[in-house]
Amino acid sequence: NFPLAFSTAGGDTASALAAGCPVIVKSHPMHSGTGELVSSAIIKAAKKTGMPNGVFSNLNSSGIAVGQQLVKHPKVKAVGFTGSIHGGTALYKLANERDEPIPVFAEMGSINPVVILPSALEAVGATWATKYASSINLGAGQFCTNPGLVLGIKGDQLDAFSKTLSQEILKLEPTFM
């Protein structure tokens, strides 16, 4: 989802380490290299600050089996997840099927609907279309706060907004994570 902020060194990791808990991260296979680099920095910082050896681990796997086994393991006491609704729901189900259910802190789906009314479109529609297009592309489209779904009332204002938005999206340069 967003490997530099949520995946490896995100709030879940920082919170657990701050509370004195060890952390095991199962990296997403699409950014395992980034995960390894960030993990190296975390391990270096842990050593530098006197944390115990093994307080942080990063596991790489292209499938879901490693994540499933981590959630099922009796020594794991909580799960943090950022990603799809399907993946998060599957982990939540596994966590609750354990003899001792554990909490799952999941950020999933991020469709982020935006409701726009004709009066707002009439006042600032063209400007807002430009800003909306930029927001969609923010962070290579990986920010969980990016807008995803526009809800509006059918009419001339929405048609004009849609046309301007399409033009603005076509102007965007592809970006890399």
Question: Residue locations for each model-derived region?
Answer:
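Active-site C-terminal subdomain of aminotransferase-like
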Residues: 136-139
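Rossmann-like NAD(P) dinucleotide-binding subdomain of oxidoreductase/dehydrogenase enzymes
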Residues: 1-134, 151-158
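Flexible, acidic loop-helix segments that line cofactor/substrate-binding pockets
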Residues: 64, 109-111, 119, 141-149, ...
